[in-house]
Curated annotation (Swiss-Prot):
Similarity comment text for this entry: Belongs to the mannitol dehydrogenase family.
Binding-site positions, NAD(+): 5-16
Keyword rRNA processing (UniProt): no
Origin: domain of life: Bacteria
One Pfam family matching this protein: Mannitol_dh_C
Alphabetized PROSITE patterns for the sequence: MANNITOL_DHGENASE
Lineage: Bacteria, Pseudomonadati, Pseudomonadota, Gammaproteobacteria, Vibrionales
InterPro entries: 6-PGluconate_DH-like_C_sf (IPR008927), 6PGD_dom2 (IPR013328), Mannitol_1_phos_5_DH (IPR023028), Mannitol_DH (IPR000669), Mannitol_DH_C (IPR013118), Mannitol_DH_CS (IPR023027), Mannitol_DH_N (IPR013131), NAD(P)-bd_dom_sf (IPR036291)
Protein's UniProt name: Mannitol-1-phosphate 5-dehydrogenase
Catalytic activity: D-mannitol 1-phosphate + NAD(+) = beta-D-fructose 6-phosphate + NADH + H(+)
Keywords: NAD, Oxidoreductase
Length: 384
């Protein structure tokens, strides 16, 4: 019997990454999205193309998929019967879909479905599914919460695949381009019932090590590349990382954050060094056109205490490790200007009004009088 999955978010990551892995594992996927034209087209065509780009390009077709509107009763009907729910909607939208998931669970319990259900949020956030669970439970009665405790697994995951926006020249709106590299790691301790066998979904009992490995390496390296690239006038991540000066600085920033991971989780230094090299080569992928503005956007979120710049910095402080290039990356983030990004505008207004160190204290939690804030301010002032 074919398994079913409901996947929230029919955007590039939904189609190009999670939806594709599910469909490749012979699971019937229903995408749920608010974008009506996209939903109509997916439910009409029931397939789409994915261009997978690594050392070469190959085109693959994902089939046996359909789509429903996130606000529809049809979605609730699907949740009543489904075996798996996944999301790729972005951290802010997670809170919005929680109510819909709760409604689906209520209907599922009312219909007497006692089969276990697993829910996996595939978002760029630490323990995103645990956060989603807290939001969902706000809309369930005490009795429903008890049923959910028994029957519903909220499974945290770490995901990694670069999926840039499609080039506008393409006339197929469903086609998506993804890199050949992908990593989807799930916390095997949180499943209810049997764990689905999905090629490309790895299980671990130490998820936090992998969440931080990705955050401190891929995400840290990506945004440092973007912010240093912006300062030198590069347009894309590839252009920036092929600048030898930026390449060396990004590599050093990832090595600094890597020392925190090695200390904290006991990662093997040689293997971690190879992981860093792999990421540098991914940034230079000639088939991925990823603009520095896309990777640099929402700087306030990226400068928050639990995110890709400050969290590794705090680790270097905790263990007394060198952090000069992480500090430089943070200074470059403070220089990020983009008039169409409200967070970038707010950041620049704050620096203008309150100065660098007060801005750091407000958005990152670093004390304004700390050595690190003073070093960041000095680096900021040296930048053009």
């Amino acid at each position: 019997m074919k398994k079913n999955a409901v996947h929230f978010g029919a955007g590039n990551i939904g189609r190009g990454f999670i939806g594709k892995l599910l469909a490749d594992a012979d699971i019937a996927v229903t995408f749920a999205d608010v974008n009506e034209p996209l939903v109509d087209q997916l439910s009409h065509q029931q397939e789409y193309k994915v261009k997978v780009v690594g050392s070469e390009c190959k085109m693959e077709t994902v089939s046996h998929v359909t789509a429903v509107n996130s606000a529809s009763e049809a979605l609730i009907e699907r949740i009543i019967k489904t075996d798996l729910v996944t999301t790729a909607v972005g951290p802010t939208v997670l809170d919005i879909i929680a109510k819909t998931i709760a409604k689906g669970l209520s209907a599922r319990f009312a219909a007497g479905n006692t089969q276990p259900l697993n829910i996996i949020a595939c978002e760029n956030m630490v323990r995103g599914t645990t956060h989603l669970k807290q939001q969902v439970y706000q809309f369930l009665t005490t009795e429903e919460q008890q049923q959910a405790d028994a029957l519903v697994g909220f499974v945290d995951s770490a995901v990694d695949r670069i999926v840039p926006p499609l080039q506008a020249a393409n006339d197929d709106p469903l086609e998506v381009t993804v890199e050949s590299f992908s990593e989807w790691i799930v916390d095997e301790q949180q499943f209810k019932g049997e764990i689905p066998q999905i090629e490309g979904m790895e299980k671990t009992d130490n998820l936090m090590a992998f969440v931080e490995r990705k955050l401190f390496t891929l995400n840290t390296g990506h945004c440092v590349t973007a912010y240093l690239g912006c300062l030198k006038g590069h347009r894309t991540i590839r252009e920036a990382i092929e600048d030898p000066c930026i390449h060396a600085q990004v590599k050093q920033a990832m090595q600094e954050s890597g020392e925190v991971l090695i200390r904290r989780y006991g990662f093997d230094r040689a293997l971690h060094s190879a992981y860093i090299e792999k990421i540098l080569s991914r940034f230079a992928n000639p088939y991925l056109v990823d603009e520095v503005d896309r990777v640099g956007r929402q700087p306030l979120r990226k400068l928050s205490a639990n995110d890709r710049l400050i969290k590794p910095l705090l680790g270097t402080i905790e263990y007394g490790l060198p952090n000069g290039m992480l500090l430089k990356g943070i200074a470059a983030a403070l220089k990020y200007r983009n008039s169409s990004d409200p967070q970038a505008v707010e950041l620049q207004q704050s620096i203008e009004k309150e100065g660098v160190r007060s801005t750091l204290a407000r958005y990152t939690g670093l004390a304004a009088e700390s050595v690190e804030a003073q070093q960041i301010e000095a680096l900021y002032q040296q930048m053009d």
